[in-house]
């Protein structure tokens, strides 16, 4: 089996992210899925869980360190499935920006700084005419 790429994913525990992880694991060439989460999760084959504080001021740097290690083992892509569901209507604009721009932006910067050139963003922000973004 020729396993020649890895994926580092943020937001892989939600409904959309879980589907992305399942699809990645169905690809024989995917050597590893590295899930960045806020809490430890149950071990799975070909899935590595790395717990990081997404609110930490150095989250981008922590991500860059992790992404560099993943990328050093061969080709890698980054995926963000971070998003907010219908409950987000209760969130302030500042809270939404902190998540969608702050956390996702820091993750993207960290992956880019590590040399990962492919970044996939799955987001519903701005997906409707009523979007606050």
Short names for language-model regions:
Residues 2-29:
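N-terminal Rossmann NAD(P)H-binding glycine-rich loop of SDR-like oxidoreductase domains
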Residues 7, 48-106, 110-113:
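NAD(P)H-binding glycine-rich loop region in Rossmannoid oxidoreductase-like domains
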Residues 6, 31-32, 117-118:
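Residues at the starts of beta-strands that form the adenosine-phosphate
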Residues 27, 110-117:
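A short helix-coil junction within the Rossmann-fold of NAD(P)-dependent oxidoreductases
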Residues 87-88, 125-131:
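Conserved catalytic-site region of short-chain dehydrogenase/reductase
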Residues 10, 36, 81-82, 119-125:
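SDR active-site strand-loop-helix element
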Residues 10, 14, 97-101, 131-133:
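Short-chain dehydrogenase/reductase
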Residues 35-42:
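Short, polar loop motifs at secondary-structure junctions
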């Amino acid at each position: 089996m020729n396993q020649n790429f890895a994926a580092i994913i943020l937001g892989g525990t939600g409904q959309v992210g879980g589907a992305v992880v399942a699809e990645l694991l169905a690809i024989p060439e995917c050597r590893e899925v590295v899930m960045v989460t806020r809490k430890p999760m149950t071990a799975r084959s070909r899935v590595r869980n790395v717990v990081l504080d997404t609110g930490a001021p150095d989250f981008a740097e922590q991500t860059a360190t992790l992404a560099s290690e993943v990328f050093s083992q061969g080709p890698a892509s980054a995926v963000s499935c971070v998003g907010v569901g219908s409950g987000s209507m209760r969130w302030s604009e500042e809270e939404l920006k902190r998540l969608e721009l702050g956390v996702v932006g820091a993750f993207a910067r960290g992956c880019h700084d590590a040399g990962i050139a492919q970044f996939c963003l799955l987001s519903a922000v701005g997906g409707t005419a009523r979007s606050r973004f």
